[in-house]
Structure formats: C-alpha cells, structure tokens
Amino acid sequence: MKIIAVVFCLMLNAGCSDNDDLTEEPPGPVHNENISIGSGNPELILAWKENTGYTVTIAGWGQKYIPVDEAIVCLEVFPVGVQSSKWYRAAYQEAEKQNDRLVCKARIITDSGSDFEVTDIYTVAENEDRLRLSRVVDVMKASGKDHAFNSYFMVRNEVQQAITGCEYFIPSLIYKDESNLSESSIGADFTHDWILAREERMGLPLAMFRNKSSEVSVALADYNLNPVTFKEEVGMDHLVNADMHFGSLGFYLASQSPALVYCFPGSEGEHTYADGGGSRERRWARRSHPVRVGVEHAYMLELQFKKEAAFPKALEEHWKATFNLYNPEVLEVDNEDVMNYSLEVLDHYWLKDNDAPGFPFSVHLPSGEVNEISYSMGFVGMQIPCAYYLYRKGLETNNSIYTDKGEQILDFWA
C-alpha cells in the first residue's frame, strides 16, 4: 500500500510540473493539398495555397472555370454615410469533404470591423453535368459603421476570351448577342462592365454563355423556389431591407474573359428598368441587406455544362435543365369558377366614357383603381369578345345586368 501511495504522489507531481518540455502545443489546422468532388463533367477542385487559402477550379467538357480575381467569395459593402461601396474578396480558409459534398468556409472582416462568415456547400450531379452550390452568409459582428452589403458568385473561363468569342442567353432578355435589342433594352450595350438583370424579368432565372470555338456552354441558374419582396420595393433609390430575397443574374464583362454573375439581393445595372426604361444611361437600381447580426442571407445556385454544335440547341438544353429543376406543379382548378370570377371582374369594371361603354385598359394594384381607359389603344381589340361572354352568361342565367352591359358594348363597338 505504501509503494502504491508513493507512486501515486509521483504521478501527481509530474502532472502538476511547470516543466515546459512536457507541454504540447495544440495541433494546427491540417490542409489537404487537393480536394475534389466529381470526375470531370463537372469536377470541382480545391488546391491549398499558402498564405492565400484554397484556390477553386471547376472543370467541365475540357474547359476550366475559375472565380473572377481568384476570389470565390465576394462581398460589396456600403459604409454608413458613404455613397460608394468597397469590395472584399476571400478564398476558402477551410474545406472538408463529406461523402458526396464539399463544405467550405471563408471569413471576411471589413475595415471597420464587421465580421462575415460564408459557408458554401457543393454537390455534384455527374450524370446531369451539374454542380450545385448552397451558400449562407452570416453576419457574426456588425461594427455599426457598415450599412449594407451584397454577396456575389462570379466565374469565368480560365483562358482569356474576347467578349465576341461567346454567345449569350438570358431568357426573355438576351438571345445570342445584342444585335436585335433596342437601345434601351437590358443587354443592349456590351461595352458596359456589368449586365445584371433581376430574375423576375426572366422566363427562368438563368444566364448562359457559349464559347463559339469549343462549343462548350456554361449556365448559372438560381434555384430559389420562394422569391420574396414587398410593395414599396420600387424605383431607383438604394433600398436596404432584410425582407428582400431574390437575386439578379447576368455577366461581368470587364474581366479577362466574360464571367457569369449572381448577385444577392438582386441589384440591377448598368442598365435597369427600375426607372421605367427608355434610357441608355449607366444606372443602378441597388438592393442590399443590412449589415446586422441575424439577417437571413442564403441562396442556392446551379452551374450547368453542355457541349452542343449550335447555339439554339445549347439554349434549349439549358432551358430544359432549369425548367426541370423547378418542376412547377400543375394545379387542378375548376374552370367554371375561373370563368365566373372573370365575368365578375368584367361586370365590376364596366364603365362609360363620354357615353361610350367598355372596359378600361389598366388598373392599379393592389387598390384596383382604374388607371387608363384608352379606348383607342391596346385593349380595344378585346372589347367585343369580353362583351360577348358577359352577354351570353346573362342570357344563360337570366342575369339582366350582365345582358344589358354586354349588349351596350356590342351595340357600340360592333
């Protein structure tokens, strides 16, 4: 028993010793030289670079794509009381492969001390030539001196390319190039550094360019099933509000090669329709989130890679891939109810303008107040068909009000 006690005391003394030789430094971060997911179409490759972080390369159909300025994370921050912004760029400082996904982290601290943590999660759908990104930006600390911010995702071809070496596509806005656009259209001037359009202006939230020589196209799509804004979100003022959850898509043309761009929330420029259109001035309609702890700043994107011999086929394939991504639900409705509600609207808006019966051209929403009558343009071609349905329903249901209103329009216009 005495021997055991002595040994125990010696062990205690050793554990409490001030001998520095027995103190081990905690292990430092371990960085893999290369981390990748996917096997070529596409493949995401991260390579560790001392004093920088992980460089990012995305491969697809023999082409390589890299972030603009080699910075996969880009934040545009607007200081308090200053009209201009400051850009902050960062590489990933941490990366971990978890089965079929890659989790990456970056940190940006502004000059005034605001602290942002960015978490990106990548997954690859190899059989479909797709790379998906889920991004969350957390404001860890707000210094009080930074007012607002936007985050960007921007990638370009690794090889230098002329703007004219590519063909471009944004549904409903740009088809191949600017040659068939009016001077006031978004995308009409490829001398601009930026062509960014809000995604609700598009048939689908998608931007694509195709290299003419390699025939490889890459597209960036927003996988946002619940875009959100509010009624007062209009006009050219720089609006800062945490309730805006929509993006803008397009191209950055001031780099060594054209770049695909996603901006969140969705600022629009260098040409915008927020001013009503009709102007070729370089103007921005900026939308930003507040620099505030707890603000929700998250989105999901998809990069698609195709190789097609002709631009129309590439356009078609990217369109189908994005449409299937959304997979919109076909809702069952009662068409009889739809017809009845429509007739109620016609009955409500029936009016006489200078003794001429008809329906107005437009109304304000959500108030429903009549905005324009304009019998001489636009809706004039539908006065007779609408009156016919109102008149017929009146006869079928013995509704004398419908019959009388429909008859007056038919007598006047026909």
Which stretches of residues belong to each language-model region?
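Low-complexity, Ser/Thr/Pro/Gly-enriched N-terminal "stalk/linker" regions
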Residues: 18-21, 295, 309-376, 408, ...
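Well-ordered alpha-helical scaffold segments within catalytic/enzyme domains
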Residues: 384-400
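Sec-dependent N-terminal signal peptides
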Residues: 3-12
